[in-house]
Amino acid sequence: MTNVPISRLRNFCIIAHIDHGKSTLADRLLQDTGTVSSRDMQEQFLDNMDLERERGITIKLQAARMNYKADDGEEYVLNLIDTPGHVDFSYEVSRSLQACEGALLVVDASQGVEAQTLANVYLALENDLEIIPVLNKVDLPGADPEKIKNEIESIIGLDTSKAISCSAKTGVGIPEILQAVVDRIPSPKDNTDQATKALIFDSYYDPYRGVIVYFRIMSGGISKKDKVLLMSSKKSYELDEIGVMAPDQVKVNSLHAGEVGYLAASIKAVADARVGDTITLVDRPAQDALPGYAEAKPMVFCGLFPTDADQYPDLRDALDKLQLSDAALKYEPETSSAMGFGFRCGFLGLLHMEIVQERLEREYDLDLIVTAPSVIYKVKMIDGEIRMIDNPATLPDPQKRETIEEPYVRMEIYAPNDYNGTLMGLCQDRRGDFIDMKYITTDRVTLIYEIPLAEVVTDFFDQMKSRTKGYASMEYHLIGYRENDLVRLDVLINSERADPLTTIVHKDNAYGVGKGLVEKLKELIPKQQFKIPLQASIGSRIIASEGISALRKDVLSKCYGGDISRKKKLLKKQAKGKKRMKSMGKVDVPQEAFMAVLKLNKD
């Protein structure tokens, strides 16, 4: 199965924005080449997580090997590496691009170029990939292929004279795409005689075989009898099996340069087989690793707490297991007076955070509370020490610190012209600095802003979508830290600080946020036997307060008439009891109240 000459190998990926039909196109390619029979075919064949199908997005990378008989009568092997389209998963895209020589740029013929497509196209151009523009969904009534071709030329600068129009749904144009892959994408370089180097572009955890590593061989070859060495961790393994994905795993004896395959070697955790790492042979190791891999850094942090304290060990096990297959997830134990034991977790972005939370709840049957997302702040202490703070509750007191810097991103928003005003208003509300505005076509515009990441991670995306009826798309990347007048806003419930509700806000917004928080808590916390003060404070200064009045038991109900002093005595006794209760009583804040307030942080 693997004795294909390098000249007849093609490695390519598909770049597309969410919903532009990438997974459906991949399905058609698999079907047309006979890789998957029509009987076994199910929609979004390569998206094999339930969550991926439901949300219609690709999260984990998949790969598939197809045999294709081209017009010249020769049989070619096409390796399709499926990539995620969402901005959070751009690191997954970058490593799959490194394993390819070409890419299909899929653009919806009715919607045009979107922000995340652009980000990935630039990554592909940096990797010197041959890009084939494909206009999908030409069967839709609103499709305008000529207009979209001009858009691709003006925005990306690609020649679209050979762009292929297709409809992945009906199958129109699929044979032309397969032929274009053979004709226009170059074959891999023939480096079979050099030292073995293979790039890991994905890995997942199999409970029976350990970590399954997907790799692309850049030079040399790997056979089943070899002992392999992973260059960054310096660990060596004996191979249990190697093979190709067709798209089900098929064992083979050896693979050579240019080929894409998988290996199993009883590797315990995905962290041992880091994506982007280089595989070489123990007997004939390569001198240096493949260039260009940076470890994924979490950008967004939040606390995860089980609603039931008994589930803490289950949550720990679940995170351990998830980390086996998600190398970008970072976590450490955390305790909170209000929530008990939990974990502080780091994610690539909001979508990544939602997906991890959903997978924990769905696959591991956990019930979780998630605190408000925060970013990493850079705090300069008075003694000159620099501290990185990812949990607002641990921000040092004002008298101990000199400055606080927060991460900024450069954001590009692509939207129809009509929504200019409302989008600029949104960016200004979120402390964004206007940089530039460009008209891409007569009716589409790009807005460029520099904006604090903390303002983006709450609900910027939802707001942008709702204000533009879903037509806007955005892309952002980190540009560094800037100093701002930031303060820590604490919420006190009955004079006790509620850690999960602590946030870091800009001084100008502190009053509005604090007032909103205490008002919401007042609605949600049930009345107790004593009065509960709710306060929002900056340091020792209270900036907003509300009170929950006490439940009052009618102690006079048994006194019919009688002496007033008897009534006074009973009321005095009740007041004394309430006073004692207030000093000793603990307010039990229901989980729903925390959840609702954390949602309010987004409104």
Swiss-Prot record:
Entries under Gene3D superfamilies matching the protein: 3.30.70.240, Elongation factor 4, C-terminal domain, Elongation Factor G (Translational Gtpase), domain 3, P-loop containing nucleotide triphosphate hydrolases, Translation factors
Entry annotated with the keyword Nucleotide-binding: yes
Pfam families: EFG_C, GTP_EFTU, GTP_EFTU_D2, LepA_C
Topology term for the membrane: Peripheral membrane protein
SMART domains documented for this protein: EFG_C
Domain tr-type G: 7-189
Entry's EC annotation: 3.6.5.n1
GO biological process: positive regulation of translation; translation
Disulfide feature: none
Family: Belongs to the TRAFAC class translation factor GTPase superfamily. Classic translation factor GTPase family. LepA subfamily.
Name of the protein in question: Elongation factor 4
Residues annotated to bind GTP: 19-24, 136-139
GO molecular function: GTP binding; GTPase activity; ribosome binding
The entry's keywords: Cell inner membrane, Cell membrane, GTP-binding, Hydrolase, Membrane, Nucleotide-binding, Protein biosynthesis
Protein location: Cell inner membrane
Superkingdom, taxonomy of origin: Bacteria
Top-level enzyme category: hydrolase
Taxonomic source organism: Prochlorococcus marinus (strain NATL2A)
Cellular component aspect of the GO annotation: plasma membrane
Gene that specifies this protein: lepA
Stored InterPro entries: EF-4, EFG_III/V, EFG_V-like, EFTu-like_2, G_TR_CS, GUFP, LepA_C_sf, LepA_CTD
Function in brief: Required for accurate and efficient protein synthesis under certain stress conditions. May act as a fidelity factor of the translation reaction, by catalyzing a one-codon backward translocation of tRNAs on improperly translocated ribosomes. Back-translocation proceeds from a post-translocation (POST) complex to a pre-translocation (PRE) complex, thus giving elongation factor G a second chance to translocate the tRNAs correctly. Binds to ribosomes in a GTP-dependent manner.
Annotated catalysed reactions: GTP + H2O = GDP + phosphate + H(+)
